[in-house]
């Protein structure tokens, strides 16, 4: 395993640990999710470029589309919770009534 792959795997692991440990605030959870998506994108792109898989070259772009949708939904939920309750705690998500 090369040094670049190890760095990206460590970035993914640190983001996952941050998501699991600092889940009280919604903004920190969203930042950890974005870090995980970024490291997954870089690892997938490097793997596809190193193995010369031309048919799988669209997969990282599709991952970026899903990451953008996740970020938009997360930020809209963050704005809704913070304007309604005045704070961005994840515990406030249980109080939402649809």
Curated annotation (Swiss-Prot):
The membrane topology term of the UniProt record is: Multi-pass membrane protein
Disulfide partners: none
Please tell me whether the keyword Transcription is annotated for this protein.
no
The reaction(s) catalysed by this protein are: a ubiquinone + NADH + 5 H(+)(in) = a ubiquinol + NAD(+) + 4 H(+)(out)
EC number(s) on record? 7.1.1.2
Q: Name one GO biological process term.
A: ATP synthesis coupled electron transport
- Record's superkingdom? Eukaryota
Q: Which GO terms describe its cellular component?
A: mitochondrial inner membrane; respiratory chain complex I
What's an example of a GO molecular-function annotation for this chain? NADH dehydrogenase (ubiquinone) activity
Transmembrane regions listed in the UniProt entry: 1-21, 29-49, 61-81
**Compartmental location:** Mitochondrion inner membrane
Q: What this chain does, per the record?
A: Core subunit of the mitochondrial membrane respiratory chain NADH dehydrogenase (Complex I) which catalyzes electron transfer from NADH through the respiratory chain, using ubiquinone as an electron acceptor. Part of the enzyme membrane arm which is embedded in the lipid bilayer and involved in proton translocation.
Q: What does the subunit comment say?
A: Core subunit of respiratory chain NADH dehydrogenase (Complex I) which is composed of 45 different subunits.
Family, per entry: Belongs to the complex I subunit 4L family.
Instruction: Write down the PANTHER family for this protein, in alphabetical order.
Output: NADH-UBIQUINONE OXIDOREDUCTASE CHAIN 4L, NADH-UBIQUINONE OXIDOREDUCTASE SUBUNIT ND4L
User: In its UniProt entry, what is this protein called?
Assistant: NADH-ubiquinone oxidoreductase chain 4L
Organism of origin is Vampyriscus nymphaeus (Striped yellow-eared bat)
Q: What is the lineage of its organism?
A: Eukaryota, Metazoa, Chordata, Craniata, Vertebrata
* Gene responsible for this protein: MT-ND4L
């Amino acid at each position: 395993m090369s040094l670049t792959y190890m760095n990206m795997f460590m970035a993914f692991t640190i983001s996952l640990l941050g998501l699991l440990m600092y889940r009280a605030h919604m903004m920190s959870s969203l930042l950890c999710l974005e870090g995980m998506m970024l490291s997954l994108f870089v690892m997938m792109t490097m793997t596809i470029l190193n193995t010369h898989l031309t048919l799988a070259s669209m997969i990282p772009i599709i991952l970026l589309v899903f990451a953008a949708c996740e970020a938009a939904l997360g930020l809209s939920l963050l704005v809704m919770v913070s304007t309604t309750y005045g704070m961005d705690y994840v515990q406030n998500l249980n109080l939402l009534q649809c």
